[in-house]
């Protein structure tokens, strides 16, 4: 018996030591893998700035690349923050070492407004007198939109490619029929005839108002893109739409015939063409640097500057609590409070890329931003893909609001949802519930019965008060009357271009424009390089991303047509019963 105990203890000790050793080895491997991309890139004395959109992804903040991606067979994709990308392209315009930009736009990923900001930077580069050359093989809406800014667009001569340059489409999902089959009844309480968040759970098709705003939104976004494309290619918007509507852009020869590309080339012919532009005898003699590397070299972090512009990134759903992956009310309020107490911060840029969420969390964030403004520090808003509902709530009081033309904003309205799952339990699962309450309405949020009239009126009153608060704060922030705000509110989603016309924003501009404006508003500052750009919250490190990933597995529906359905169910289940939300009804993905 003693020998058995000794052997057991020895085995346990061995396993413990092995586990500790394995942990240290694993941490060492992670550190080594993370350091692979940490070496400082080198800019050739004279070279080409290469932009391969399939090898990078536009993000709000520059993050570390996932070092484990290559282990799964995937290619390493570099996340590049949109401000970092814009800053790099602007630097290249005046850098004598950069001769021209060579861009491969196929595989472009990023939000719709991020892509607009990126193209705007490319347009400024071209206006500086330097050339942009693009080569496309499988044009999509996003890739051709980017390519169209180029001086020369070359396209593969292979006629077997696939064109997906066919305009924008939005698909709205409705779950009422399946919820009926499951025995689930969702009660939606809202204010705003356009506030369609929650409609997917109570209808099997779009309401008239929802369809109206969706059509207006898609057409406004496409109109912005089509005008830019048409202007760059010196054709009319009408002719461009005619080509697309008549499916006249199928093969590379079609693009050439219609004047949308300049020449069809094989890869070998492309290499020869690049040699001519670069003035090189062989393709191998062309020196190039990738945009993510160049962005790292041209980072504008001036640690010696005594004055700071704090850039606060509010990206994701606005939620209660302090979780890291969303715009958590308590966490962001604490971050903004620290910024407020930093006497070296002389201006703040609030970068909003959020469809909204919790009203309580939104108000906490707004309150802290108001305290910064009360200190005499200007707060400038910059809108990304979304600045809607709660995203607009937190920024309506900012001293100046920049938006992209394709940003989705507004959605000034509120709603609450309470599902009743008693039918599922009793009729489908044969589970019976007997409530025991201390008071008459104690179980009204329990989801085990429908609300009665008194409870519905109670919830509606709460929604009405919050809607009135929302419109009042917008009126105060934008210098409008409450009735004027109510007329353009009602939960209606507007594009940035539309929002400018109705007074919800001040100017069409990028995050770079917002940061420049904030910097120049500081006494004694005449150039952005004179201030330190401090970003909040700090991006997650590789180790932190690894720890986060342990609790967040990839969706089994990722990449499939069911992914949007899964998101819809998650949107419902993540909304706490009875809480009031200021959230946009949908999110848009452009390909």
Regions found by a protein language model. Name each.
Residues 2-42, 46:
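N-terminal type II signal-anchor transmembrane helix
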Residues 5-8, 12, 214, 332, ...:
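Hydrophobic alpha-helical elements at and bordering transmembrane segments
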Residues 40-42, 49-175, 301-424:
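Cleft-lining beta-strand/loop regions that shape enzyme active-site pockets
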Residues 176-273, 422-502, 506-522, 526-528:
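Charged, glycine-interspersed solvent-exposed loop segments at helix/strand-loop junctions
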Residues 231-232, 262-306, 415, 471-477, ...:
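C-terminal long alpha-helix characteristic of the crotonase
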Residues 304-344, 462, 536-591:
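Intrinsic disorder and flexible/low-complexity segments
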Residues 313-316, 352-354, 381-385, 405-407, ...:
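Active-site proximal loops enriched in glycine and acidic residues that flank catalytic Cys/His/Asp
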Residues 359-364, 498-501, 545-549:
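Short glycine/threonine-rich loop-to-helix capping motif typified by GTGT followed
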């Amino acid at each position: 018996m003693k020998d058995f105990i000794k052997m057991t203890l020895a085995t346990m000790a061995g396993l413990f030591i092995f586990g500790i050793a394995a942990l240290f080895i694993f941490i060492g491997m992670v550190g080594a893998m993370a350091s692979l991309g940490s070496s400082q890139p080198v800019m050739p004395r004279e070279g080409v700035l290469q932009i391969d959109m399939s090898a990078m992804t536009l993000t709000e903040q520059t993050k570390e690349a996932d070092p484990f991606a290559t282990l799964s067979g995937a290619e390493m994709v570099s996340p590049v923050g949109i401000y970092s990308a814009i800053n790099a392209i602007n630097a290249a315009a005046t850098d004598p070492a950069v001769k021209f930009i060579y861009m491969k736009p196929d595989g472009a990923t990023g939000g719709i407004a991020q892509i607009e900001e990126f193209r705007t930077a490319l347009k400024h580069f071209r206006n500086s007198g330097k050339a942009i050359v693009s080569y496309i093989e499988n044009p999509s809406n996003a890739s051709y939109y980017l390519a169209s800014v180029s001086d020369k667009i070359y396209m593969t001569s292979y006629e077997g490619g696939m064109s997906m340059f066919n305009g924008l489409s939005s698909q709205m999902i409705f779950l009422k029929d399946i919820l009926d089959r499951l025995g689930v009844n969702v009660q939606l309480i809202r204010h705003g005839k356009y506030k369609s968040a929650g409609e997917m759970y109570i209808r099997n098709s779009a309401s008239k108002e929802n369809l109206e705003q969706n059509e207006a939104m898609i057409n406004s976004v496409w109109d912005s893109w089509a005008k830019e494309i048409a202007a760059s290619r010196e054709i009319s918007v009408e002719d461009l739409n005619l080509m697309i509507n008549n499916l006249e852009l199928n093969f590379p020869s079609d693009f050439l015939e219609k004047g949308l590309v300049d020449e069809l080339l094989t890869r070998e012919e492309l290499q020869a063409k690049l040699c001519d532009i670069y003035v090189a005898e062989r393709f191998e003699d062309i020196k190039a640097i990738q945009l993510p590397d160049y962005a790292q070299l041209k980072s504008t972090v001036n640690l010696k500057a005594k004055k700071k512009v704090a850039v606060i990134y509010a990206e994701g759903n606005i939620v209660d609590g302090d979780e890291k992956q969303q715009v958590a009310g308590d966490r962001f309020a604490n971050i903004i409070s620290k910024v407020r107490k930093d006497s070296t911060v002389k201006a703040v840029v609030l970068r909003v890329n959020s469809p909204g969420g919790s009203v309580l969390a939104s108000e906490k964030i707004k309150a802290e931003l108001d305290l910064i403004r009360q200190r005499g520090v200007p707060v400038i808003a910059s809108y990304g893909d979304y600045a809607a509902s709660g995203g607009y709530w937190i920024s309506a009081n900012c001293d100046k609001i920049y938006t992209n033309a394709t940003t989705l904003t507004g959605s000034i309205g509120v709603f609450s949802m309470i599902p009743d799952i008693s039918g599922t339990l009793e009729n489908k699962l044969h589970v019976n519930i007997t409530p025991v309450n201390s008071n008459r309405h104690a179980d009204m949020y329990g989801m085990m019965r429908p609300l009665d009239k008194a409870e519905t009126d109670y919830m509606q009153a709460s929604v009405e008060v919050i809607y009135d608060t929302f419109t009042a704060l917008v009126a105060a922030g934008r210098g409008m009357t409450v009735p004027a705000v109510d007329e353009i509110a009602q939960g209606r989603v507007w594009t940035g271009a539309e929002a400018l016309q109705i007074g919800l924003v001040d100017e069409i501009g990028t995050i770079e424009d917002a940061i420049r404006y904030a910097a120049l508003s500081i006494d004694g500052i005449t150039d952005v390089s004179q201030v330190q750009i401090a970003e909040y919250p700090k991006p997650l490190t590789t180790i932190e991303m690894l720890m986060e990933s342990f609790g967040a597995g990839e969706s089994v529906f990722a990449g499939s047509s069911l992914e949007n359905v899964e998101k819809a169910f998650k949107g419902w289940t993540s909304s706490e019963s009875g809480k009031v939300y200021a959230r946009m009804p949908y999110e848009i993905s452009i390909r």
